Curated annotation (Swiss-Prot):
MORN repeat segments: 358-380, 381-403, 409-431, 432-452, 459-479, 483-505, 506-528, 529-552
Assembly behavior: Homodimer. Forms a heteromeric complex with ALS2. Interacts with ALS2 and RAB5A.
Residue span, VPS9 domain: 796-942
Keyword list, A-Z: Cytoplasm, GTPase activation, Repeat
Gene from which the chain derives: ALS2CL
Any single biological process term in GO: endosomal transport
Keyword Repeat tagged: yes
GO cellular component labels: cytoplasm; cytoplasmic vesicle; cytosol
InterPro entries assigned to the protein according to its UniProt record, in alphabetical order: Alsin_GEFs/MotNeuronReg, DBL_dom_sf, MORN, VPS9, VPS9_dom_sf
Gene3D superfamilies documented for this protein: Dbl homology (DH) domain, Histone H3 K4-specific methyltransferase SET7/9 N-terminal domain, VPS9 domain
Protein name: ALS2 C-terminal-like protein
Amino acid sequence: MCNPEEAALLRLEEVFSATLAHVNSLVLQPLLPAAPDPSDPWGRECLRLLQQLHKSSQQLWEVTEESLHSLQERLRYPDSTGLESLLLLRGADRVLQAHIEYIESYTSCMVVQAFQKAAKRRSEYWRGQRKALRQLLSGVSSEGSVGASLGQALHQPLAHHVQQYVLLLLSLGDTIGEHHPTRELVVNAVTLFGNLQSFMKQELDQAVATQALWHTLRGRLRDVLCTPAHRLLQDSQDVPVTVAPLRAERVLLFDDALVLLQGHNVHTFDLKLVWVDPGQDGCTFHLLTPEEEFSFCAKDSQGQAVWQWKVTWAVHQALHGKKDFPVLGAGLEPSQPPDCRCAEYTFQAEGRLCQATYEGEWCRGRPHGKGTLKWPDGRNHVGNFCQGLEHGFGIRLLPQASEDKFDCYKCHWREGSMCGYGICEYSTDEVYKGYFQEGLRHGFGVLESGPQAPQPFRYTGHWERGQRSGYGIEEDGDRGERYIGMWQAGQRHGPGVMVTQAGVCYQGTFQADKTVGPGILLSEDDSLYEGTFTRDLTLMGKGKVTFPNGFTLEGSFGSGAGRGLHTQGVLDTAALPPDPSSTCKRQLGVGAFPVESRWQGVYSPFRDFVCAGCPRDLQEALLGFDVQSSRELRRSQDYLSCERTHPEDSVGSMEDILEELLQHREPKALQLYLRKALSNSLHPLGKLLRTLMLTFQATYAGVGANKHLQELAQEEVKQHAQELWAAYRGLLRVALERKGQALEEDEDTETRDLQVHGLVLPLMLPSFYSELFTLYLLLHEREDSFYSQGIANLSLFPDTQLLEFLDVQKHLWPLKDLTLTSNQRYSLVRDKCFLSATECLQKIMTTVDPREKLEVLERTYGEIEGTVSRVLGREYKLPMDDLLPLLIYVVSRARIQHLGAEIHLIRDMMDPNHTGGLYDFLLTALESCYEHIQKEDMRLHRLPGHWHSRELW
């Protein structure tokens, strides 16, 4: 059984549908061709608004027809169709939206007086339709303008219809009672359409006020401000207010903008970028905008409250993106708009941001958070901002004169300038990776030319205020030389070492990029020159040459066009040949560059990070970042994203790193932790190690692989091990402090050396081993050559003959290991005696850890003693006279290549605590064997005479 209210709703919808159709044919359809001239911008705008109104009217009619159909179905089949099937109840939101869109389209036309303008174009036609219009309306004065009549015809039926909705739905709610299943739907519909009445009234009031405003403005101001979207919320002529420091004659608050009028000038502020600060005196409040701050002062507290409330809620509404429903300020929380927002703004004031457009996050009138800056000249910056300045990671593009060429800076910024680690790719194809301060290269960094550069170079070292300064390495690919030394103001200045591709080495003093004073020059054939030079290391002035054979030439040297090198001096051929090690193994740079001060630019950022407590926001700025880098310079938009690998992606947050560090303090666990940390390029310790590897390769790989730099390199590796241990201790201190604990007092030298040589050095040495061992190979090439000849000669002898030659006592020979011929003494068997010791010693080449190499040597000694004990059938401790011949035998059968380089590397890198102990003794014994095998009688292919083991000592 249907209610009377449902029948009344049906009749209401029938009448309204017919009215909409009638209005469409009588008013809307004729208005479209009567719109102002489309060739005029205002004419086009009016036509667009009328078309939008026509579209909204059609949508409203369609919804009304659908509602009518649902009512008809309900009345036709009341038993099978429930009350909830009515569109007004189940689809109240949809009906509401159709009404809202219509009223918004209507008021937009009303604000720009589109009806009046259209009526003027067909005034005769509309005068003839007055009677028909009066039939549509109730209470329309015959003296009213045609435009006003058109407006009433388009609005009044809608207002009446909504009013009837509310009345009938209220009555329906009373009829069905509180416990009816659809009671909640009815109450919701009553609320929505009641709110719609309030919304329509507010919209009409604002449109009337806005329309009236245009008549009070001069022509130019009206043209600037008159837009369909504007709705006037407050006018200072109604509630007076003064603005400082800009003395505005009139203040207009629209729903999307705040406008200050000052003479012919119009100052417009987007409400999405207006922040309200309550005042202190009850009559004043403050507004913040991206470029200006204002004080609004009303005559009394009531006026101040009106303005502050309306501005606050207008800002809220603008940020919300749609009009408040049902009225301004309804349903929005909190009472104050958020301080942080997202918006776009183009700066106008003079300064570095003039004409730049910022799009991104804001806070209280300043860019704050993530955003993008674009200048008209093509400059772009995307990244993080703080209080209006670039701060944090950001990418800056600077266009160059060449088309599609940019300088690209992927850096960390502080207070508007580059500060911290960055990667810069220049339009010249040069790339800089390193640190900045106040926008200039400062600290450690690498500058490298492009691969196709006519004069390729790479500088790895320290910078100061944009110039090379301090310790640094420069490789000149064109000249095939590398400079290792000190810099000042972008020039070589101070002690330096130069090495060339040809193997020539120079050490001397530089001043303003030129050699000054005496220096030394070592040639590849080990000739030595001591004197003065030209820039390209040509002998010039007084000097002395010492040749490999001992001859010396002392005098004045020079060169000239067509003359080559010439000299006047004394040639001394009577001098004795020099000690080969005096020149061949002479080391350069030692003492000139204190090892602890060479790479402070690498260590310092890590120390700063630790001293600051390892904050997350400084991790990339101080420790660097991994970034996908390309030399190909692309269009600017391609650069506005940076594929950075954040440290937390692979190793977790800094908190996780420190927590894990605390869980691995026991020796075995610590070793596993450090191995994992050093092998991960995203871990702070791993990053530090990667940078140290880079400096080491820049110095000692390629052209720098020169035997005269071996000591410089090995002391550098040991220093790096100390610094890495100190870095670990720094992280441990921070981890403990975060737990409220303290790190034990500074460790003593012995404890530190034990950890550095026993723990850190073995873990980090593989990263430097290739370049370091190459230097040892070159330094000991001559001895290793003699040693190899001796090994080759000794390998020709069968086991028994070699044992006899080495004067190994026969009762120590492991004869059971041999398959003998009828002549036992001259067995043809080779490589069978002391086989276990030989195979053990060969393992010395399978590790780079000095301690493990010494352990191999100790096990070899044990295998030799074990074999002898087996032969004798009892425990036997070898005296030195018996050990050395047997050790030489094992060394000759192990055939270890470059044994001299191995021995010297082990001695240089082993723990100082082993000095004087068993390892030191065994290494000395191995070194004695190595030196003896180099002797002439060991190298010549002849049956040597007997020798005695005491000759080794």
